[in-house]
């Protein structure tokens, strides 16, 4: 399952199961369930996050990817006790809520870290507060250009870590740095995923 935001054309884009959007009636039934059982006022994002989690629970999924809406520490998705935290980049954005420096923003993003759980960081220049939070929680940190790296050629690209080297990877529709970070995340998962599956997914 994948929960992402914002949507571009239709709300249904936010919640995908087995790479498929869900029909309107599935969402409205979930909305009704949340509305009947909520005990306090919810923001739009909190409501949609709860609905997504409800749908994922009904589907009995093995893996769920939750995209943080804003920051991390106070984000609605942070209600979930995740098994793996992924930081793609650290940019100056939403400064009214997250702080005006990369250091302040990195602290907010590090709010999704969990004690003794793996963390994958795709940002090459990691601010100290994020590293300190990972150390404080005894997280296993996998960092770009430290634990893994990638390089593009003319027609393909390669990715390597301390454990494995993947060559002749096809280019995909997302930024290469994000794809490389995703591969670093895959390496942390307790699943045996073949190189063929990785190439097909890219």
Identify the residue ranges that each predicted region occupies.
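ATP-dependent carboxylate-amine ligase catalytic core
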Residues: 2-80, 96-98, 104
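Short amphipathic beta-strand/extended segments with alternating polar/hydrophobic composition
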Residues: 21-26, 162-170
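A short glycine/serine-rich beta->alpha loop
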Residues: 38-41, 167-173
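Acidic, Mg2+-coordinating active-site environments of NTP-dependent enzymes
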Residues: 62-67, 82-166, 173-199
């Amino acid at each position: 399952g994948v929960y992402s935001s914002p949507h571009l054309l239709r709300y249904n884009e936010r919640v995908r199961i087995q790479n498929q959007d869900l029909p309107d009636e599935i969402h409205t039934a979930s909305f009704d369930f949340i509305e009947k059982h909520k005990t306090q006022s919810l923001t739009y994002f909190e409501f949609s996050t709860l609905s997504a989690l409800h749908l994922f629970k009904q589907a009995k999924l093995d893996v769920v990817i939750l995209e943080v809406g804003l920051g991390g520490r106070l984000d609605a998705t942070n209600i979930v006790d995740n098994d793996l935290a992924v930081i793609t980049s650290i940019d100056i954005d939403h400064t009214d809520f997250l702080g005006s420096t990369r250091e302040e923003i990195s602290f907010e993003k590090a709010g999704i870290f969990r004690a003794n759980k793996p963390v994958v960081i795709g940002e090459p220049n990691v601010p100290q507060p994020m590293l300190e939070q990972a150390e404080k929680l005894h997280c296993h940190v996998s960092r770009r250009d430290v634990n893994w790296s990638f390089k593009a050629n003319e027609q393909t690209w390669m990715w390597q870590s301390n454990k494995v080297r993947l060559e002749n990877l096809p280019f995909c529709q997302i930024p290469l740095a994000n794809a490389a970070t995703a591969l670093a995340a895959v390496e942390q998962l307790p699943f045996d995923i073949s190189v063929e599956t990785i190439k097909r997914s890219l």
